[in-house]
Amino acid sequence: MIPDCTTIATDPKRFGFHVEPRRLALSILALACLSQAQAAPFAYVPNERSGTVSVIDTASDRVVATIKTGGKPRGIAASPDGRRLYVSDQPTGSLAVVDLAAREVSERIAVGKSPEGVGISRDGAWIAVAVEENNSVSLIRAAAPRELTSVRVSGQNPEHAVFSPDGKWLYVSAEDGAVVDVIDVAKRSAVKSITVGERPRGIGFLPDGSRAYVAAENSDRVYVIDCERAEVIAVIAAGKRSNGIAVRPDGKVVFVSNGGEASVSAIDVASGKITATVPVGQRPWNMALTPDGKKLYVANGRSNSVSVIDAEAMTPLRDIPVGEAPWGVVVR
């Protein structure tokens, strides 16, 4: 176990430093502090036109690395242990697996024509990839990634595939349709279609799994689904071309990006009303929150940037330049 930085620096003999103790203590202090800094969450941003993933240190809000994936990276998910990224690559019809220790692609898994959204179950056991031109979802067991199950959905051009918090259900939105398909993960089959607004895109669950929120881009609405009944129970007017969804970890606020208005709106879960709207870059798309729920990172597809929002005060903090046409964000 590494002692805290202050203890090492002030009492080196306690830890057996007898040869040049001050210099040795300072060296260990620097290494310990560096290790602590590297442990801060990172935001990973796939850039469609650059063929890269930008790595943002959420402590400093600076890009600290760029991972070359090639092709057209879009959907992205991170393993719970922080060792791997899963990134869909549209031109090659594959899922790129990124080794985060080496920050390079370690393998590619064929999933189908034009993959987009990528989801991962909370326990990391399952990965899901929405495959647009196949009108299907590829379900992949993380322990045996070459064993893939393709599940057909009713919605045309599926975009996002998001697991419920308990991992039992997978909700799939479709760009060319007005439905969300529900897949039973254990059965590997679609069991229901829920009618929502036109061009449903982002999906987010409350932490307890009781509700799902779906942004419908062409309807400028967010649809609230009761997950036990698998039916819409409320519709919330959002901004123009609403598309991305992110849920604060405390379950009190749902964020929706408004692609046609360069803004992000905050929905109070208790009242079902928008309580704040924050300006961001052009064509805000998919988003992610830090684990503590304090900061929201928003990919701005036409500004080539990521906007950072104070997710408690609902105020803009800064914009971070990234690659061309950022698609979304995952924080791990």
Briefly describe each language-model feature range:
Residues 28-29, 33-332:
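Predominantly soluble domains enriched in secretory-pathway, periplasmic, or organellar proteins
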Residues 4-25:
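Bacterial N-terminal signal peptides that target proteins for export
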